[in-house]
Amino acid sequence: VAHGDDMISIQAQLIVAADGTESMTRHLCNLPVKIKDYAQDAIVANVGLIKPHGNRAFERFTPNGPLALLPMMNDKMSLVWASKPEEAKRLVMLNDGDFLRELQTAFGYRLGRFGKVGKRYSYPLKQVLMPQQTKWPVVFVGNAAHTLHPVAGQGFNLGLRDIAALAQCISQKGLNPQMLEHYLKLRAHDQQMITWLTDGLIHLFTSRLPGMGVARNLGLLALDNIPALKNLLARYARGFGGITPDLVCEIALSTGEFQ
């Protein structure tokens, strides 16, 4: 490991690579990735409100891409606004007043007027998946293993469930290659479902195919009026659609079987 001008040697029985989308560990392990470019950039910033947000999160689907606002402390919200790259560049370059006016037009007045906005950044949106997430003694988790579009806000939650499952596998099976094989089997369904859901939402809400607008509206109407469908979607989004790690259920780790 490089530390300034020095090189430090660290020995470990297991390396958990959680070093993000552009994982250097993945590069050093010479492992492949599958990349899908969504041809969108995400604008991120903190936005201040004039009235309380009530700890509610919001998402709007605009013609250019989804716009999400997540509650923070002191009546601030974290903004993630996906847009076409050229439009994102234009929005980032606006002064604060003009940016807030554009945001207000896109989002509406459900939260009242936006009062201020912090420094804005943008980054390209892409799906990055590792077909092989382990190479003993290394295991990849979170964005290093699977970077998703932020449309459903599930990337961070998915990474937490990776860690919860890995901790439980280590607790019950020790540090060995067979433990990592077991971990991969446990995580496969959850990762596949959330990846499919996220990618499907992007195609659904960005497609310009004839009749797709009607299909979107009917789908949202069904989701809003059929509790069983809404509950099923929420269950998968929370990680309860398959085998759920104990830590996700707030159960302390044990040495019993997890299968």
Tell what function each PLM region has:
Residues A2-R120:
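Conserved FAD-binding catalytic core of PHBH/FMO-like flavoproteins
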Residues A18, E22, Q40, T62-P63, ...:
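A structural signal for well-ordered alpha-helical scaffolds and beta->alpha junctions
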